From Swiss-Prot:
It catalyses: 6-phospho-D-gluconate + NADP(+) = D-ribulose 5-phosphate + CO2 + NADPH. It holds the Pfam family 6PGD. The lineage of its organism: Bacteria, Pseudomonadati, Pseudomonadota, Gammaproteobacteria, Enterobacterales. This is 6-phosphogluconate dehydrogenase, decarboxylating. NADP(+) binds at A1, V2, M3, G4, N22, R23, S24, V63, K64, A65, N91. Substrate binds at N91, S117, G118, G119, H175, N176, Y180, K249, R276, R434, H440. Gene3D superfamilies: 6-Phosphogluconate Dehydrogenase, domain 3, N-(1-d-carboxylethyl)-l-norvaline Dehydrogenase, domain 2, NAD(P)-binding Rossmann-like Domain. It comes from Citrobacter amalonaticus. The active site is at K172, E179.
Length: 445
């Protein structure tokens, strides 16, 4: 696959000779033919491939997550020696990584489940890397990982030891969930600016370009400004001819499922997963649009003022999403005994990965100041933003509701913020109801 090829080329570019193997002989030959003069050495049997490596062997697996990973590991095992290291760089479900780590360590092998973010380009030029597994095995591969990782502005490589067994893949899963949330928040901002102000694509590009110079500076805002003005071969704006059905690979779903297992209110990211699901009901939505009534969007008033409100709402929404995501990391760390370092995790997201953003430094700073902080919203910087920006978020959500513009993640952000700051919630009534019909008992205040 492209990710595997690009990681191999990245490693080779740092002065290493890389043995390569693919089940398909043609694919192996293709990679070698496309990269003449590179220190890539092809092998056509698993045995020859494994025997070409110096011990302890460091084998990077890049295969489709699931049964394919197990069969690849099974094919390697007969030729491995005790202490050899297998690194799984796929988008693997963390529970599978926990299982594989346990099974392989019982046989004397090391297994490092590694999240890799940055897409195909990141794999080649420097991704963000999230390794989890045996600490001593990580130390043996750390020099290579540090050389191939993205480098943040302060010169630090975007890789750090995450924790035992499935910790690396868990952090990658939450990273992907946060990515879903970021993308949906941006999509809702776009919808509001189009629906409320009727901005042209050029105006949208200018707006996002301005936003990218400030607090919202990030990879996703940066690419979005370019997307607005991209045209197809007929000269039409590409974004306007793309069908409004967002696909997904299931990693956002895993994050939400884990939040339910841990009892964590990951509402914003979960709404972003649901938003993709409802977008895929295109036929039903078109039919429903002819039957179900609602308000037509009215102009949102002063242009500059509304743009600034949406910008503030977007930034505060993003903060709520990360607060929920990092709160879930804390719950998972407690549940699985990982001892995660949240400030370091935010640090390795600063370059190479899809969610890279200027404000991640603020998260690192918050944890440096108070490693035990229960929720990022309580950190002084984020509390100040919430104080200053919540009215904009409330105004934008109110406008959207009054004008029939769906804003599931903006709405989730304000609902979570108000629930989290509520000393008293109406859950007492729910407890009374539960006790009434099921003798579930209750606690008195």
């Amino acid at each position: 696959a492209v990710m595997g090829r690009n990681l191999a080329l990245n490693i080779e570019s740092r002065g290493y000779t890389v043995s390569v193997f693919n089940r398909s002989r043609e694919k192996t030959e293709e990679v070698i033919a496309e990269n003449p003069g590179k220190k890539l050495v092809p092998y056509y049997t698993v045995q020859e491939f494994v025997e070409s490596l110096e011990t302890p062997r460091r084998i990077l697996l890049m295969v489709k997550a699931g049964a394919g990973t197990d069969s690849a590991i099974d094919s390697l095992k007969p030729y491995l020696d005790k202490g050899d290291i297998i690194i799984d760089g796929g988008n693997t479900f963390f529970q599978d990584t926990i299982r594989r780590n346990r099974e392989l360590s019982e046989e004397g092998f090391n297994f490092i489940g590694t999240g890799v973010s940055g897409g195909e380009e990141g794999a080649l030029k420097g991704p963000s890397i999230m390794p989890g597994g045996q600490k001593e095995a990580y130390e043996l591969v750390a020099p290579i990982l540090k050389q191939i990782a993205a480098v943040a502005e302060d010169g630090e490589p975007c890789v750090t030891y995450i924790g035992a067994d499935g910790a690396g893949h868990y952090v990658k899963m939450v990273h992907n969930g946060i990515e879903y949330g970021d993308m949906q928040l941006i999509a809702e901002a776009y919808s509001l600016l189009k629906g409320g102000l009727n901005l042209s694509n050029e105006e949208l590009a200018t707006t996002f370009s301005e936003w990218n110079k400030g607090e919202l500076s990030s990879y996703l805002i940066d690419i979005t400004k370019d997307i607005f003005t991209k045209k197809d071969e007929e000269g039409k704006y590409l974004v306007d001819v793309i069908l409004d059905e967002a696909a997904n690979k299931g990693t956002g779903k895993w994050t939400s499922q884990s939040s339910l297992d841990l009892g964590e209110p990951l509402s914003l990211i979960t709404e972003s997963v649901f938003a993709r699901y409802i977008s895929s009901l295109k036929t039903q939505r078109v039919a429903a649009s002819k039957v179900l009534t609602g308000p037509q969007a009215q102009p949102a008033g002063d242009k500059a003022e509304f743009i600034e409100k949406v910008r503030r709402a977007l930034y505060l929404g993003k903060i709520v999403s990360y607060a929920q995501g990092f709160s879930q990391l804390r719950a998972a760390s407690d549940e699985y005994n990982w001892d995660l370092n949240y400030g370091e995790i935010a640090k390795i997201f600063r370059a190479g990965c899809i969610i890279r953003a200027q404000f991640l430094q603020k998260i690192t700073d918050a944890y440096a100041e108070n490693p035990a902080i229960a929720n990022l919203l309580l950190a002084p910087y984020f509390k100040q933003i919430a104080d200053d920006y919540q009215q904009a978020l409330r105004d934008v959500v109110s406008y959207a509701v009054q004008n029939g513009i769906p804003v599931p993640t903006f709405s989730a952000a304000v609902a979570y913020y108000d629930s989290y700051r509520a000393a008293v919630l109406p859950a007492n009534l729910i407890q009374a109801q539960r006790d009434y019909f099921g003798a579930h008992t209750y606690k008195r205040t």
